[in-house]
Amino acid sequence: MDIYSTLSHEKENLVPINENRINMFVCGPTVYDDAHIGHGRTYVAFDTIKRFLEYLGYSVFYIQNITDVDDKIINRSKETGISTTDIAKKYEKRYIEDMNALNVNNVNLFARATDHMAEIIDQIERLIEKGYAYETEDGVYFEIAKFKDFGKLSHINVDELQSHRELAKSTKKNKNDFVLWKKRDDPSEPRWNSPWGMGRPGWHIEDTAITEYYFGSQYDIHGGGIDLIFPHHEAEITQMEAVSGKSPMVRYWLHTGFLMVSGEKMSKSLKNFITIRDLLKDFDGDVIRFFILNKHYRSKIDFSHKVLVDAGKGLERIKKYYELVSGQLADKNSNATADYELVSNTKKEFIDCMSDDFNTPKAIASVFKLINESKKDILDEKLNESELAAIKGFLDDVSYILGIDFQQKQDSSKDKELFDLIADIRTELRANKQYELSDKIREKLVDLGYEISD
């Protein structure tokens, strides 16, 4: 199993700290608004990564943080007059609903920042004790000059840095020192008591406090969008390795590529984003997920409705093939031993692709290759029970790994509309004394397994 790590800029063999246990952390949402499809791209990718690692036999514990205290939440509260707590609760709930719609349901623990304030304060205290952080009149800052490896993830030259929007404070020793704790006097804003007075944590310290509490100072995989490499993930490494004295903090850093719209990155700041919730009005969650997985997680994705429509057509091919195989197998001995050389070769190809840095597009291509090479024989009923069972078993594995249900979904509301239409047609036929045609329609419906009573 080879994984591309942003830290080394090369593929590395997966060697967990503990032999069969993998601890994985992915930066979760700041809950002040609905998640957009760019967020969905990241979380579908890591959900699939966990699924495949578990398929290989690893035990994976996956944590995602929830940033429920942040300037964006506070600003939204001031705009709407709704409390920061209620805003965070509302959008956390909606985020979970959106993830469930995309079948992203393998996170073992959602860790809220506000539930880990003691751990955050403790980590800041230890950074001060070790000489890496200092207090000013407006907060506590990490002194990056004290950490010689700052920039090793992003490969950014510290001397050439422009002051980041969140970090520009005149009270800092260096313009690039980043905030660990923000002192706040305004009682209308969320704040907690600390050794440095009332205030709230900076963004970066939340994640390292959470991961240290659950995983210790070193763990296996940290993931997120490529836009988080700097300053966020760089700051995480700086904090954790400084406070623990251990390196590396994380063995494998994985980052998803941008989702693009008309050549620009999809983002809320550019106001060119499409929420998952809105997209689900036009496309099934399985189609959205299939669209995402048709690109490698590290590559850019160009978003358009046409690409989603095309993804839907591709997924429909797989679903119809699965239905064909399942139907023929049901007519035979569905408990037959699975054995088919074509499937064995395809399965090896699929696993090899996924083992090469989770290459989902190539893995999916192997499934279409199987369809192309076997469908005619299935239609001609040339495959025996064991061969059909092998195909179905493989497709069931693929379904689990990709997190996509290959069974055709029945839309009961549309079914009712169709049957009402058929009933109206038959009523009109009988009124015109076309009894033979009406009865023929009835017989065909019965043959298809529907109960019709006149």
Kindly give the residue locations of the regions a language model identified.
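Short catalytic-loop micro-motif centered on adjacent basic/acidic residues
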Residues: Y62-I63, V107-A111, H222-G224
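N-terminal, positively charged, Ser/Thr/Ala/Gly-biased leader segments
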Residues: E97-A133
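Short, polar/flexible loop-turn hinges at active-site or ligand-entry regions and domain interfaces
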Residues: T80-D86, V107, R298-D302
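N-terminal, positively charged nucleic-acid-binding surface of large information/translation enzymes
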Residues: S8-K11, I17-N103
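Structural preference for alpha-helix termini/caps and helix-kink/transition segments
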Residues: K265, K271-D454
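Short phosphate-binding/catalytic loops that engage adenosine nucleotides
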Residues: Y58, Y132, Y450
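Alpha-helical recognition segments enriched in aromatics with Gly/Pro capping
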Residues: M1-Y32, D47, A118-S326
